């Protein structure tokens, strides 16, 4: 099978990484940002088309206020510190998620990241911020309902393609591979619509320990998968892989 065009990652385990080391959760989030930087560079070096990162869930607002403030501060720091480098490296930044109720300074930073890089032609870095897939789908349905109510849209013409065109990810191909770190085996309200035919890879290592070698191993695992897209015959055949490891940490198989 050919290499994935679009990889999406649920960056899980920052808090558990910190707890295992007797550190505050904030230290885990900071280590997670360092891993993020490294993987974005690695994805660009490998010629990946799209990398989507689940940075902040719409459910994360229920966390303790101090942790939320720390996460927002890290987002601001990442954009202010790294945006120039991303732009120099020809990375295009896209933000998905609900922005209407975000603080004005955060909205301004997100808009700046998109506007500065919108002509870049290298890696498409998609940051899911204040994102929840159910909310995304509800917003898309409401948009279609408004068009129906206004007489602009015949309900019988609504298709899967039209729904996709009204999602935050309009114009972005569905992920070929979704990776989740920290051993959890669920999507947690991430790209539910877009994941219809994605391959999944659940790794035991916590996100701060995820390295480019793990990304390379994910590529190799993907190459060994058989993707049928609802058909009978796979579009590419290879031997199935039973064990999935985090080679950088020699983690247990999942």
Swiss-Prot record:
This protein's GO CC annotations: cytosol
Keyword line: Magnesium, Metal-binding, Transferase
Instruction: Give the main EC class.
Output: transferase
Cofactor binding comment, as recorded: Binds 2 magnesium ions per subunit.
- Active site residues according to the UniProt entry: 12, 60 (proton acceptor)
**Residues at which Mg(2+) binds:** 12, 199
The molecular function terms in GO held by this entry are:
ditrans,polycis-undecaprenyl-diphosphate synthase [(2E,6E)-farnesyl-diphosphate specific] activity; magnesium ion binding
Q: Where does this protein hold substrate?
A: 13-17, 25, 29, 57-59, 61, 63, 180, 186-188
Q: Which domain of life is it from?
A: Bacteria
Q: How does it assemble?
A: Homodimer.
Protein name as catalogued: Isoprenyl transferase
User: What organism is listed for this UniProt entry?
Assistant: Brucella suis biovar 1 (strain 1330)
**Native organism taxonomy:** Bacteria, Pseudomonadati, Pseudomonadota, Alphaproteobacteria, Hyphomicrobiales
């Amino acid at each position: 099978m050919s290499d994935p065009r679009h990889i999406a990652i649920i960056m899980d385990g920052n808090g558990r990484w910190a707890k295992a080391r007797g550190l505050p959760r904030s230290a885990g989030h900071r280590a997670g940002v360092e891993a993020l930087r490294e993987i974005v560079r690695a994805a660009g070096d490998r010629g990946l088309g799209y990398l989507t990162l689940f940075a902040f869930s719409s459910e994360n607002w229920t966390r303790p206020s101090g942790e939320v403030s720390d996460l927002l501060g890290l987002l601001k720091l990442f954009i202010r510190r790294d945006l120039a480098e991303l732009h120099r490296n020809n990375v295009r930044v896209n933000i998905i998620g609900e922005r209407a109720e975000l603080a004005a300074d955060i909205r301004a930073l997100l808009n700046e990241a998109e506007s500065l890089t919108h002509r870049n032609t290298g890696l498409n870095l998609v940051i899911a911020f204040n994102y929840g897939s159910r909310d995304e789908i509800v917003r898309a349905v409401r948009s279609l309902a408004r068009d129906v109510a206004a007489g602009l849209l015949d309900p019988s013409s609504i298709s899967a393609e039209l729904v996709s065109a009204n999602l935050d990810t309009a114009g972005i191909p569905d992920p070929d591979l979704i990776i989740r770190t920290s051993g959890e085996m669920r999507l947690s309200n991430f790209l539910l619509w877009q994941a219809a035919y994605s391959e999944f890879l659940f790794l035991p290592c916590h996100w701060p320990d995820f390295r480019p070698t793990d990304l390379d191993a994910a590529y190799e695992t993907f190459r060994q998968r058989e993707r049928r897209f609802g058909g009978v015959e796979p579009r590419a055949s290879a031997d199935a892989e039973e064990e999935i490891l985090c080679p950088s940490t020699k983690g247990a198989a999942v």
